[in-house]
């Protein structure tokens, strides 16, 4: 079963996932999204970029998902759809697919969402950070029959790391 780390903003989902991946030591493919606070624009807001799981984190218009200003996203859906093609590539044997993070910005990116769900239907282990929001897509992900949700909060995040490491090791 795939692993979903579900929780609110800034609770440690990505940190927990990185600790788990470091402990398991398997090749990682997939993606990570990041709000680049240092590139804040007063008119546009905080830029959000999508990066391959490994490699340099270079910010270009090709991986700029959009901006968040006053918690209101301005989304470039085409970037999600283009990245879906990369995500469709067959993962290396013995690897883990990272999806950090699944949220509301991809709500209208149909190809991207279909690719995520295809991986959840598959056998290559997935570990994903999932925003604690209710959207049709996120509800579909959280209720996927091949997924186990681990709900993270400030009180349980340290002990949850070991539980998730043990769980992921059993997937190989």
Walk through the language-model features, giving the residues of each:
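Walker A (P-loop) ATP-phosphate-binding motif of ABC ATPase nucleotide-binding domains
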Residues: 2
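Phosphate-binding/switch loop-helix module in NTP-utilizing enzymes
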Residues: 67-117
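Hydrophobic positions on the alpha1 helix immediately C-terminal to the Walker A/P-loop
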Residues: 16, 20
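Hydrophobic anchor at the beta1->P-loop junction of P-loop NTPases
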Residues: 5
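N-terminal phosphate/diphosphate-binding loop that engages ATP/GTP or pyrophosphate donors
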Residues: 22-70
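The conserved Walker
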Residues: 9
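Conserved lysine of the Walker
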Residues: 13
């Amino acid at each position: 079963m795939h692993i979903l780390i579900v929780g609110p903003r800034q609770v440690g989902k990505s940190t927990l996932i990185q600790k788990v991946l470091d402990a398991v030591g398997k090749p990682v493919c997939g993606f990570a999204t990041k709000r680049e606070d240092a590139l804040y624009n007063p008119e546009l807001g905080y830029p959000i970029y999508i990066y391959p799981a490994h490699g340099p984190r270079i910010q270009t218009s090709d991986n700029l998902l959009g901006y968040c200003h006053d918690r209101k996203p301005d989304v470039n859906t085409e970037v999600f759809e283009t990245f879906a093609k990369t995500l469709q590539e067959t993962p290396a044997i013995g690897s883990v697919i990272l999806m950090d993070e699944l949220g509301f910005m991809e709500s209208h990116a149909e190809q991207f969402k279909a690719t995520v769900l295809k991986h959840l239907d598959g056998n290559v282990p997935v570990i994903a950070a999932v925003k604690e929001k209710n959207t049709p897509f996120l509800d579909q992900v959280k209720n996927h029959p091949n997924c186990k949700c681990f709900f993270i909060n400030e009180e349980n995040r340290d002990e949850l790391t070991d539980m998730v490491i043990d769980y992921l090791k059993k997937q190989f």
